[in-house]
Amino acid sequence: MRFAIVVTGPAYGTQQASSAFQFAQALIAEGHELSCVFFYREGVYNANQLTSPASDEFDLVRGWQQLNAQHGVALNICVAAALRRGIVDETEAGRLGLASSNLQSGFTLSGLGALAEASLTCDRVVQF
């Protein structure tokens, strides 16, 4: 089966993102296709490269990045939600006159069209 995941919780502070990550790993281990992960609302904090968890905690932001690098899973970040929460790529930082960007590599700013496309092309969309 082909899946898409929607993450609406931040990397830390709630269970949503870590549960979504574990679900993503289980899908791949069972031979399913994970087309994309769409980060929405507070979920966009999963793409902040400035996140620095304690040394004894799992680095969820880097975990998502590895999922992208190893399995080609698209990591789409809602651009409107990201900009409202201070998550920007180099292009947006330049356009907005900001000193720097903080979007972790492997993540892509995208619109809700990416979520709509995933809904149309995947067998299941699971929200966390």
Swiss-Prot record:
Enzyme Commission numbers on file: 2.8.1.-
UniProt organism field: Escherichia coli (strain SMS-3-5 / SECEC)
Name the record gives this protein: Sulfurtransferase TusD
Intracellular or extracellular location(s): Cytoplasm
Enzyme class, broadest EC rank: transferase
NCBIfam families: PRK00207.1, sulf_tusD_dsrE
Residue positions of the active site: 78 (cysteine persulfide intermediate)
InterPro entries: DsrEFH-like, Sulphur_relay_DsrE/F-like, Sulphur_relay_TusD/DsrE
Similarity field: Belongs to the DsrE/TusD family.
Main location: cytoplasm
Superkingdom of source: Bacteria
Subunit structure, as described in the record: Heterohexamer, formed by a dimer of trimers. The hexameric TusBCD complex contains 2 copies each of TusB, TusC and TusD. The TusBCD complex interacts with TusE.
Entry keyword set: Cytoplasm, Transferase, tRNA processing
One Gene Ontology term of the molecular function aspect: sulfur carrier activity
Summary of the function given for this chain in its UniProt record: Part of a sulfur-relay system required for 2-thiolation of 5-methylaminomethyl-2-thiouridine (mnm(5)s(2)U) at tRNA wobble positions. Accepts sulfur from TusA and transfers it in turn to TusE.
A GO-annotated cellular component: sulfurtransferase complex
Biological process according to GO: tRNA wobble position uridine thiolation
